[in-house]
Amino acid sequence: PGDEEYTHAMLEKFEEEHPDIQIDYTFMPYTDHVEKLKVDLSAGDAADVYGVQTGAMYKEFRDFEEDLTPYLVKEYGDDWASNYNEYAMSLLKGDDGEYYAVPLGLSYAGYVWANMKYFDKYGLELPTNYDELKEVCKTFRDNGEYPLVIGAKDSWINIDTWMNIAADINTEKLYSAIEGETPFTDEDLVQSFQIWQNCFTDGVFQDGALGVGMYTDSTDMYQKEGSVPMILNGSWSLGAYMDSDEQSQEVYNGEGANHKIFLMDWNNDGKIAPVEEA
């Protein structure tokens, strides 16, 4: 979403180098892509090549995925994996030791994006922990502004945010729980769910957040309208600085534009932890 011009450039470059291949493409929000992919795969009508996030979704489609290892060895040699980020490859290695995908990119989730014109207007500093975040959001609300915006209608941003909270509290327990080795009733994980719930009850997230999607309902408010002080999203949103859309250019690069991106200390213990995704 929001990357159409970059995608067009990549497609044009690919077709220039491979004139015998024509690519048919459709742009859609990521959530719609996932739902369509489920239907198309079940019907045997899916694209030959598709992209998904690592983790549960990557494993969910395993019955439809082919081991790419022999193709990669044939094309690039036995040391083909060294061409990719080691951490990204570790996320893609199947339980059988095979690879059913290769990395398209590695980015960080769990960031808070801030439009500093709102902070300057009300004389506020960027919050560094949850207690400060509550106070900042209260000030924004008291002045008729939005607090921290999230498109909680979409499951992926909820998962990204909760994982960031859980990783901030205890990274080892988070990934141990994902592997089924630590129960989700562990006190640190319970605390992460409590903080997540508190974001709604403490007024940190905007009212009605569960009924609003990320792309493009929430992202347009921050990126194109410049009408909200803060939004949760990943590092991939840096592409907005190069977006050719006139509204985005004005918000991000216009006179006086000033945006910050930072990670939150959710449990007030003085440390932060991003969630990584391939």
Model-flagged regions — what are they?
Residues 54-110, 125, 134, 140, ...:
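Hinge/lid segment of periplasmic solute-binding proteins
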Residues 95-104, 110, 134-182, 201, ...:
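Extracytoplasmic/periplasmic solute-binding protein
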Residues 139, 179-210, 264:
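Glycine-centered hinge/linker elements that transmit conformational signals in sensory
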Residues 1-2, 21-26, 49, 100, ...:
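Short, well-ordered beta-strand elements
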Residues 1-9, 30:
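Extracytoplasmic "Venus flytrap"
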Residues 197, 221-236, 241:
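Glycine-rich, aromatic-lined ligand/substrate-binding cores of catalytic
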Residues 13-84, 117-128, 220-223, 229-230, ...:
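Extracytoplasmic "Venus flytrap"/periplasmic binding protein-like
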Residues 12, 16, 22, 202, ...:
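Extracytoplasmic/periplasmic substrate-recognition and gating elements
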